[in-house]
């Protein structure tokens, strides 16, 4: 029984660790993407023009 009990304990932590990593990445990336999508094109183009002018 001990030999059968070891693999689940080894697999368990990995299965528990992976989802939080994915959710943490999504929690950071999704709001940013939604915020960028919510911005009007004029704001984005103005930001690019300002960045280009500063680069010059």
UniProtKB/Swiss-Prot annotation:
Transmembrane segments: none annotated. One of its GO terms (molecular function) is nutrient reservoir activity. The modification Phosphothreonine is found at residue 45. Disulfide bonds: none annotated. Keywords: Allergen, Disulfide bond, Phosphoprotein, Seed storage protein, Storage protein. This is a seed storage protein. Hexamer; each subunit is composed of an acidic and a basic chain derived from a single precursor and linked by a disulfide bond. Belongs to the 11S seed storage protein (globulins) family. This is Cruciferin. It comes from Sinapis alba.
């Amino acid at each position: 029984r001990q030999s059968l009990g070891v693999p689940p304990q080894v697999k368990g932590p990995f299965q528990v660790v992976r989802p939080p990593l994915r959710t943490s990445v999504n929690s950071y990336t999704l709001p940013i993407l939604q915020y960028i999508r919510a911005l009007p094109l004029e704001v984005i183009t103005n930001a690019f023009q300002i960045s280009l002018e500063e680069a010059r």
